[in-house]
Amino acid sequence: RAIDFSMNHLGKHGMPAGLYADWNDCLRLGADGESTFVALQFYYAMTILKEFAAYKKDDDYIKYLDESQEKLGKLIQELCWNEDRFIRGFTENGEVIGKRDDPEANMWLNPQSWAVISGFASDEQADKALQQVYDRLNTEYGAILMDPPYHAHAFEGALAVIYNAGTKENAGIFSQSQGWIILAEALRGHGDRA
């Protein structure tokens, strides 16, 4: 049912719609906005459900998931990969969040982690994205959520701008996202960085 719900609630580009918010509740992309982070989790969910469907010998559902995952994968590849990182997403007005030339918040942690965890990123993409995370987001206390923090260029749904730079959702460090980046680095064989 969760797959069907998401397939019935897609944004303008065909990725899962933001509805209220994704994991980052200070990032409001709008009801029809789209989160790359959620799209990558959805991609991974389809991989897992295909294993269950194979166990049940449900070839029709496997075919449905294969087709849906292939379509979603093409969208993520075409819309969300930005040279050396995956963008954060799209507002419902079509604004791209987290692209390389954004003056603020142009590098986000969670899409990079989940591109690797989901198995979506190619080896080259995974290594480029994780290098950006290591170079730009890593601190002695853990990886920050994004860089640079919001200050003057936040979009309307960037509620993180109410917090000082480096605190909470405005480039703070969150325990959940640490587990994800540790897993992503470990999956790429970067035990020293994990």
Predicted ranges, named:
Residues 1-21, 28-41, 45-56, 64:
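Mature extracytoplasmic enzyme cores
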Residues 1-14, 35-43, 126, 171-194:
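Aromatic-rich carbohydrate-recognition surfaces in CAZymes
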Residues 13-17, 84-85, 114, 193:
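Beta-sheet entry/capping signal
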Residues 15-18, 86, 146, 163:
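Short clusters of hydrophobic/aromatic residues that line enzyme substrate/ligand-binding pockets
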Residues 20-24, 91-93:
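Short linear capping/connector segments at secondary-structure termini
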Residues 26-39, 94-118, 160-178, 183, ...:
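Solvent-exposed loop and edge beta-strand segments that line ligand/cofactor-binding
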Residues 41-158:
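Catalytic cores of carbohydrate-active enzymes
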